[in-house]
Every structure is written in C-alpha cells, then in structure tokens.
Design a protein with these regions (language model features):
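Preference for long, amphipathic alpha-helical scaffolds in soluble/luminal domains
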Residues: 1-300
Length: 300
C-alpha cells in the first residue's frame, strides 16, 4: 500500500499525524497507512474528534431548534448545511444534536420526488444539490435511511434525464460541478449497480473535457475546506469508481501534483467564512490529506 508514496517529493505524513487535528490524524492512520478500526492509535484519534476546537464551536453554535444561524425555513439552508458538511467531513459520529439538524434538512429540503431542493419546490432541485446532500448524509450514517435511498434513486433518474448536465442557474450550460457532486455523493453510499451507467457517463464527461486551468477552470485549483468543486474532488470521485488507470486521469493527476509545495503539502486557497477550519494562504492539512487519498486510491 506504500507505493503511492513514490509520487511524493517530500513526506508530509508526520505533519498529518500531529495530534492537533484528530480528524486528519484519524483519516491518515486509516486511509493512508491502512490501520484497522481496532488499532489503538486509530481508536484514540477517533475518540478525540468530538473534543476538537472546530467541532465544539460548530455544535455550540447550533440553535435550540436544531438549525444554525438562520431560522428554520423552506429555503437553501446555508449555515445548517455547511455546519453538517463540516461535521461529516471531520468524521463526527451523529449525536442527538446532529440528528436534529439532519431532520430539518429532510423536512424542509427534500421534495416528494426524493430529490433535494434549495426552495422546497422541485424547480429548486439543481443537479449538484442532491449529490451534495448524499455525500453529507452518507458520511453521517444515513446511507440506509429510506429517504436517502429514495434520493439516490431519484437522482439517478434526474441525471439520466439531464445527461447534458445543463444547469438552470448557468444559462443551461453543462455543469461539471454536478458531475463532481454526483460522484462524490454516490461514493459515500453502498455500491448501487443501477447507477453504474450514470457513473460511467459522468466520469467520461469529466475525462473528456478540455480543461483550461489558467482560465475557465482556474477556480478548480482553489482548494479549500470544506471540500468544494475542485480538481481534487473530481480526481477522488474518478479514482473511487476505478478510472485512475485512464491516461486522461493521469494528465489531471499531474496538474494536482504540480500544486504541492517543496514539503509535499497543498495550500488552502479557499474557505467557508461561516465556520473557518483553516487559514487561507497557508499549507492545509485537509487539502493535503485529500490529495494523498487520491494517490492512495490510485495505487490500491
């Protein structure tokens, strides 16, 4: 499992294993070093996650009603979604407070069709949003919830119907971010053979696109926390579903590798202003972890 390290220009693993960020340490031990869930250090790192500063801050900011910042309403739940996305990404086990927030998203933002919507109406079910929600809910332990299964199946139908990935918020132009969101969402759930044709199509869309990282796709190199629609997210989804051996993948991987510094770290170039996880313009443990996980998936 260690041969992926040959791609590194420096070993950043000791840095990722430092105890100041137990979530990063936990994922590094588990996903990069291959430690099992019963490993003593893995268990210790996981137990420390709820005590970390950012997790405590986010949970402390939750309102008694279960939402964050804005009152509960049928609209895009910016703060609530972001809070839960960060908690999910940090590997926080769902507790009563988190479950209360999740129920608000189900109640206000899942349409009867199963899709998740910004507005409560089906017209607000953008191609990227259900994928984002599947990612969060899958990582929070809701993969087997009937509402998530309904969303999963409705999302397959939506993506088949809009195979051109036209986005209503962008003059109906193809939205590669939707492809990233979908791959990321389905990667967080148990394998679903019924979705394989859609996954293959989305992967092909990402692999055949003519990228201009100095122009239109420059924002794809603005890696940040929580993970957004960027090159690392695209590569992670592609690698998860078995496309790492594709030559076109290799070219994109070289672009990602070109963004590391001399110490083998990647920078945080974007962050969410509602809950600041890391400092912009500084080496990022989270971005570095994400990049190294892509390499590990390529070699696994």
């Amino acid at each position: 499992m260690d041969d992926w390290k040959s791609k590194l220009n420096a070993d950043s693993l000791p840095w990722l294993l430092e105890p100041d960020n137990p979530s990063v340490r936990h994922f590094t031990l588990r996903d990069l070093l291959g430690r099992g869930k019963d490993d003593r250090e893995v268990r210790a790192a996981k137990a420390a996650i709820p005590k970390s500063k950012i997790v405590r801050e986010i949970l402390a900011a939750q309102k008694p009603g279960g939402y964050w910042e804005e009152a509960e309403k049928k609209s895009w739940p910016t703060h609530t979604y972001v809070a839960l996305a960060i908690l999910a990404g940090h590997g926080v086990a769902p507790n009563a407070k988190i479950k209360k927030g999740v129920e608000i998203l189900f109640r206000n933002n899942q349409h009867a069709s199963g899709l998740f919507t910004w507005t409560g109406a089906k017209s607000g079910a953008l191609l990227c949003f259900t994928g984002d929600m599947l990612f969060v809910l899958g990582h929070l332990g809701y993969a087997d919830d009937s509402r998530v299964r309904q969303a999963r199946d409705a999302y397959v139908a939506q993506l088949r119907a809009k195979s051109d990935l036209g986005c209503s918020r962008n003059a109906n132009k193809p939205c590669l971010w939707a492809a990233i969101a979908a791959l990321r969402g389905y990667a967080a759930l148990p394998p679903n053979p019924a979705a394989r044709d859609v996954i293959d199509h989305l992967a092909n869309v990402l692999l055949t696109h003519k990228y201009d990282f100095a122009g239109a796709e420059k924002p794809w190199l603005r890696f940040g926390v929580p993970a957004g629609f960027d090159l690392i997210a695209a590569l992670d989804g592609l690698a998860h579903f078995g496309f790492a051996r594709d030559k076109r993948f290799g070219k994109l991987l070289d672009v990602m590798l070109g963004e590391r510094d001399e110490a083998g770290r990647w920078m945080c170039r974007s962050f969410n202003t509602k809950f600041v996880v890391e400092k912009r313009g500084a080496p990022s443990k989270w971005v570095t972890l994400r990049a190294l996980k892509v390499l590990a998936k390529c070699k696994s």
